[in-house]
Amino acid sequence: MESQQLMACAILVIVLVGIFGNSLSFILFSRPHMRSSSVNVLLCALSFFDFSLLTLSIPIFVIPNLDLWANDLSLSTYMAYILKLIYPINLMMQTCSVYIMVMITLERWVAVCRPLQVRVWCTPRKSRNAILVIIVSAFLYNFVRFFEYRFVVTESGALYEKWLRDPGKHRWYYVGYYTILYIVTHFLVPFSVMAFANGHVIVAMCKLSKTRQMLTRQQQREQSTTVMLLIVTFVFAICNTLPFLLNVSESIFPTLFQDESTRGLAYWLNDLSNLLVVLNSGTTFIIYFTFSEKYRQTLVFILKNGCCATVSDYNNYTAMSRTASMRISSETGGQIQRQGSKMSNSSRSSDVLLKPIYMQKRSERFSSEYNERTCKHLAPFEEHKLPKLPSEKRKKKLHKMSAVEHRGMPEITITFSEDLPDGEPDSPCQPC
């Protein structure tokens, strides 16, 4: 009994931490600027389902194993209501969590392996529609769970007994639904899809890692998001393998929890599987915080400004953060830029010399080198040129002087009005 209480206390600690983390993740992913991405819509839904799963784990897995009961009858009465009403809802949340993980894996596969179709296939509206389909399907699939137990006073004093869950009375339900259909819907289909998609994503990311320097900032951000979600998927697969194996073992050996030889080991494995399920749902926010820069930035913004801040406040906050980071980088790089500007004038002339003559523009060539090349062709014509007359030289000199005077002093033109009275002097200035 002490080991069960220790396990219950460990589960309670993980549940409380997970409730805080998933509630924080739900607030972050439900912000307006975060809902613009399809994967953030799915992560918001996953945070909600994990939060619900952890909350329901307290009355199902923690409270029955604590030393809180005066007698067995009170515990039996409590378990009757839990198994009849609360446990089926917990299974619905678990089904939703499994298929939300499948949708996240498929979204990453499209983003990495089919980038041209990502804007058509992966939109926030389609993600919301997929979440709605998952919720309805999980409710319909697990609705029959409400009839696995029924309220009845047994010979031992318990207020419930197995009904559809009893393999002796309802063998078809136990083999068909509880065993085969559960294996197909909760293990074979989701884990096969996730293994196939994640394999393709890992191969594609290995190819992209070779050309990492050629990636844009947006592509690098998508790659870090993919790494984060791959880790979430792997943790999900590891933590849900033992519950699946235990469920299959119970279907093969119906007396696994009743036989005295296997009862202790079966209950210990059952508590361990519950701990792994809770651990998976309670630690996802740690992975988000570790690998997502936007998650950390939004978390700091909410802690500083509260949950009621607007989108414009967030945009101003991110703009100020980018400006501060650019200012820091500019201070370190300013000296390098100034040194480079000093060397640019000298390097520009050396660059001209490195070019072949036929690739140089005439404006880039040195005047001496240009004159040397042209004088070779003009030398024969200079010998036959007639000398200029002195009058031509004098005219050219006077023309240059008049041009200089024309540029230096503006010309003033005075026009006289034609309506001046007769007899007055033709003067441009009249007394007032």
Curated annotation (Swiss-Prot):
Transmembrane stretches, start-end: 9-29, 43-63, 85-105, 129-149, 177-197, 226-246, 272-292
Chain intervals for the UniProt region annotation (Disordered): 328-349, 388-411
SUPFAM superfamilies with a match to the protein in the record: Family A G protein-coupled receptor-like
Spans within the Cytoplasmic topological domain: 30-42, 106-128, 198-225, 293-432
A single Gene Ontology CC term: plasma membrane
Molecular-function annotations in GO: G protein-coupled receptor activity
Record note on disruption phenotype: Decreased locomotion velocity. Restores normal quiescence during molting between larval and adult stages, in neuropeptide receptor npr-1 mutant background.
Its membrane topology: Multi-pass membrane protein
Tissue note: Expressed in a subset of neurons in the head, midbody, and tail, including AIY, ASI, BAG, URA, CAN, I6, PVQ, DVA, RIM, and VC, and in the anal sphincter and intestinal muscles. Expression from the ASI neurons is involved in promoting arousal.
A Pfam family hit: 7tm_1
Subcellular location: Cell membrane
GO terms under biological process: G protein-coupled receptor signaling pathway; positive regulation of protein secretion; signal transduction; sleep
Keywords, comma-separated and alphabetical: Cell membrane, G-protein coupled receptor, Membrane, Receptor, Transducer, Transmembrane, Transmembrane helix
Extracellular side stretches: 1-8, 64-84, 150-176, 247-271
Residue ranges that the Swiss-Prot or TrEMBL entry lists as coiled coil: none
Family matches, as InterPro entries: FMRFamide_rcpt, GPCR_Rhodpsn, GPCR_Rhodpsn_7TM
PANTHER family (UniProt xref): FMRFAMIDE PEPTIDE RECEPTOR FAMILY-RELATED, FMRFAMIDE PEPTIDE RECEPTOR FRPR-18
Family: Belongs to the G-protein coupled receptor 1 family.
Entry function: G-protein coupled receptor for flp-2 neuropeptides. May act through the G(q) alpha type of G proteins. Involved in mediating arousal from the sleep-like state called lethargus, which occurs during molting between larval and adult stages, in part by regulating touch sensitivity, and working in concert with neuropeptide pdf-1.
Name this polypeptide is given: FMRFamide peptide receptor frpr-18
Species name: Caenorhabditis elegans
Gene that produces this protein: frpr-18
